[in-house]
UniProtKB/Swiss-Prot annotation:
This is SPbeta prophage-derived uncharacterized protein YomZ. The gene is yomZ. The lineage of its organism: Bacteria, Bacillati, Bacillota, Bacilli, Bacillales.
Length: 131
């Protein structure tokens, strides 16, 4: 069975992101991994299960699956970052005079789309191996 440590290490090694965005508490890391598994299962029509008591998932993940799951973690962090930025600053753009709000928001949207495209590329590469 693949451990949470393996999943988290793969994420940290492959998905550059600021420490500010990455959970530091064990419980928050578990929640992030479980959320990524929900997205993984939905996209791949899989049934991967997480067990916090053993800090493992219910099977040994292939390298492809491990990489895809790590990129789902990054995708979720980026999506949450974009949503937080939007909800925090959009109401105040005129009052505070944030001139580059649109540029920053577009940059975050592009990062989310790029990450989504990367996940699709990884899924396609894994599928090609099975053909």
């Amino acid at each position: 069975m693949t451990s949470y440590d393996q999943i988290w290490e793969t994420f940290l090694n492959n998905c550059e992101t600021s420490d500010f965005d990455v959970p530091q508490q064990e419980e928050d890391i578990y929640k992030s991994i479980r959320n990524a598994i929900l997205h993984f299962n939905n996209r791949l029509r899989d049934n991967l299960k997480a067990d916090n008591s053993t800090e493992t998932v219910n099977r040994e993940l292939s390298e492809d699956d491990l990489l895809i799951l790590a990129h789902f973690l990054r995708y979720i962090f980026l999506l949450n970052k974009k949503t937080l930025f939007e909800n925090t600053w959009q109401p105040f753009t005129n009052d505070v005079g944030i001139k580059n709000f649109g540029t920053q928001l577009n940059s975050l949207k592009q990062s989310v789309m790029d990450q989504k495209d990367e996940i699709e590329r990884l899924i396609l590469n894994a599928a090609v191996d099975y053909l």
